[in-house]
């Protein structure tokens, strides 16, 4: 179903009138206006970490965006390499697919044992852990601060902005 949806949306954004005959959607001569300002269309970021998401990204995506997953940088890189291989097999330029991800993060006051599948630790530990994503080629890293109470979450974000981000700038 998602593959059909991505194909339909992409075509609606780029073609004047479309017809579609699929397993889940069937229609004739449909138009969509206004068209997006972005050319050729709004970028499509495909989420998910499994083979179906890899194939979907390779065929339709402008970015692979595994969201909210427990995954090591090495596993993430292997997934992206697979996306690029599949894109090449589909006749697309694999370098045109952006390497992105979303990770959970927690800034602590005391050092904690490190696990490459989790971003948790002091600012110093996080700088080191986050550099691993840069080293494997991630171009966009979204962070989800995993603290349940709002005031604590604000503190996490502020600490990250002041104590971690300055060390990640080129």
Per-region residue spans from a language model:
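Active-site-adjacent structural elements that line small-molecule/cofactor binding pockets in enzymes
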Residues: 1-170
């Amino acid at each position: 179903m998602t593959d059909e949806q991505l194909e339909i949306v992409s075509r609606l954004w780029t073609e004047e009138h479309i017809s579609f005959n699929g397993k889940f959607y069937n229609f004739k001569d449909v138009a969509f206006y206004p068209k997006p300002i972005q050319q050729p269309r709004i970028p499509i970021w495909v989420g998910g970490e499994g083979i179906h998401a890899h194939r979907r990204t390779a065929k339709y995506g402008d970015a692979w965006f595994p969201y909210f997953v427990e995954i090591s940088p090495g596993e993430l890189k292997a997934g992206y390499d697979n996306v690029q291989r599949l894109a090449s097999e589909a006749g697309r330029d694999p370098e045109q697919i952006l390497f992105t991800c979303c990770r959970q993060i927690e800034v602590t006051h005391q050092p904690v044992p490190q696990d490459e599948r989790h971003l948790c630790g002091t600012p110093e530990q996080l700088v080191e852990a986050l550099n691993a994503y840069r080293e494997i080629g991630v171009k966009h890293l979204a962070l989800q601060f995993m603290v349940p109470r709002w005031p604590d979450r604000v503190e996490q974000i502020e600490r990250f902005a002041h104590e971690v981000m300055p060390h990640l700038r080129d």
